[in-house]
């Protein structure tokens, strides 16, 4: 029955798109490193996190929808 399982192509496509989104990832990692010592909780890297995933999503979307048609 394991051979009949449907594999989600999104995870594979996300992995294949990660090399194209290195710049936003590095910006996110730099932000995380910068705010590690912040005990106030006011600093965050939400913008950089979303920029990274927006890059991944923009790369994945056309490939994913082509597979779903």
Swiss-Prot record:
It comes from Arabidopsis thaliana. Component of the ubiquinol-cytochrome c oxidoreductase, a multisubunit transmembrane complex that is part of the mitochondrial electron transport chain which drives oxidative phosphorylation. Its main location: mitochondrion. This is Cytochrome b-c1 complex subunit 6-1, mitochondrial. The keyword Disulfide bond applies. Signal peptide: none annotated. Gene3D superfamilies: Ubiquinol-cytochrome C reductase hinge domain. GO terms for cellular component: mitochondrial inner membrane.
């Amino acid at each position: 029955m394991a051979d009949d399982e449907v594999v989600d192509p999104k995870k594979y496509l996300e992995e294949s798109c990660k090399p194209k989104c290195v710049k936003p990832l590095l910006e996110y990692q730099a932000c995380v490193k910068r705010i590690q010592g912040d005990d106030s909780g006011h600093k965050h890297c939400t913008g950089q996190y979303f920029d990274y995933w927006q890059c991944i999503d923009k790369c994945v979307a056309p490939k994913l929808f082509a597979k779903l048609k």
